[in-house]
Amino acid sequence: MSNAITMGIFWHLIGAASAACFYAPFKQVKQWSWETMWSVGGIVSWLILPWTISALLLPDFWAYYGQFNLSTLLPVFLFGAMWGIGNINYGLTMRYLGMSMGIGIAIGITLIVGTLMTPIINGNFDVLIHTEGGRMTLLGVFVALIGVGIVTRAGQLKERKMGIKAEEFNLKKGLLLAVMCGIFSAGMSFAMNAAKPMHEAAAALGVDPLYVALPSYVVIMGGGALVNLGFCFIRLAKVQNLSIKADFSLARPLIISNILLSALGGLMWYLQFFFYAWGHARIPAQYDYMSWMLHMSFYVLCGGLVGLVLKEWKNAGRRPVAVLSLGCVVIIIAANIVGLGMAS
C-alpha cells in the first residue's frame, strides 16, 4: 500500500473522529431549543467556515465562482440540499427506531448507496467487477457493512441491558425514515463527484491538492444550509413552545456560553469534511468514490470508541463491549482491504 493511500485512509479516520465527537459541545448547551442550537452551529459550519476558508485559498473569490455556469453549480447545490434532507431525517430516525437500529440501518444504506451509485452513474462499475483491485475494494465495502452491522448489534445489546428505548418506537415509520436518511445522506458523495470541475479549477489556480475540494463546499454546504436552516427557522416561527427571542433572553453569560459551545460543535462538524477533502485528495482517482465508504465506516468505528472513552458502555456488561470491539476490528480490516485493493 502506497504512502499516499495510507495517508488518505488516515485523514478519513481523523475526519470521522471529528464527526463522532462533534455533538459533545452541543450536549453542554443549556436552556436553548434544539432548533436555535443547531442553527447557530450550522451557520458556523455551513456558511462562515466554508466561505472564510475559500476566501483564504482562492486568489480571486468571486472570479472563481463566476467562471462556472448554472449547469455545473446547480447539481452540486441540489446534491448538497439532498444531503441536508438526510441530516434532518437522521434525527427523526433515532426518534422512532432508537440510536443503535437507526444508526445501523441509515449508515449501512448511505455507505452502500453513496459508494456504489457513483461508479454506476459514471459508467465505471465494470472497474469494480473486472479488475483485481476493483473486486478487492468491493469486498472491502461489504466487509465494512458487516462491521457496521456488528457494531449496531452491540448497540442493541447495550440498550437492552441498560433499558434504553426509542423515544416513540414505530418500526414502520422508523424504517421508512432510515431508508430515506440513508439515500439522501449519500448526497454528499454525489455532490463531491459533481463538483469535480470545481476541484480541477481550484487546482489550475495553484491551490494545494489537499485543499482543492474545499472551495466546492461553499456550494455543497450552501444547499445543506438552505434545508437545515429553513427547517429550523420554520419550526421556530410556527411551533408554539419554541422561541428564538426566549432563547436569547437568558442571562448574558449563559447566552455567550451557548453560542461558543454551538460554534465549537459547528467547527468540529466542519472539520470532518475538511479532513475528508484531505483524504479524498490522496485516494487514487479511479477509486475516489471509496472516500465515502471510508468516512462512513470510520464514523461508526469512532462513534463506538468515543462511547467507550466517555464511559457510555460502563454499565452495559461484557458481552456488548466484546461485540462492539469485534465490530471495530472488522471495520479496520475492511479499511485495509480497500487500501490494498486501491494499491493493486
From Swiss-Prot:
Protein's cellular compartments: Cell inner membrane
One annotated GO molecular function: rhamnose transmembrane transporter activity
**Superkingdom to which the source organism belongs:** Bacteria
Membrane topology summary: Multi-pass membrane protein
What is the protein's major site of localization? membrane
UniProt cross-references to InterPro entries, sorted A to Z: L-rhamnose-proton_sym_RhaT (IPR004673)
**GO CC: one term?**
plasma membrane
Q: Which residues form a coiled coil?
A: none
Keyword annotations of the record: Cell inner membrane, Cell membrane, Membrane, Sugar transport, Symport, Transmembrane, Transmembrane helix, Transport
Residue spans crossing the bilayer:
4-24, 38-58, 68-88, 101-121, 137-157, 175-195, 214-234, 259-279, 290-310, 321-341
- Catalytic activity from the UniProt record: L-rhamnopyranose(in) + H(+)(in) = L-rhamnopyranose(out) + H(+)(out)
Q: What does this protein do?
A: Uptake of L-rhamnose across the cytoplasmic membrane with the concomitant transport of protons into the cell (symport system).
Sequence similarity: Belongs to the L-rhamnose transporter (TC 2.A.7.6) family.
What is the protein name stated in its UniProt record? Answer: L-rhamnose-proton symporter
Q: Which organism is it from?
A: Salmonella typhimurium (strain LT2 / SGSC1412 / ATCC 700720)
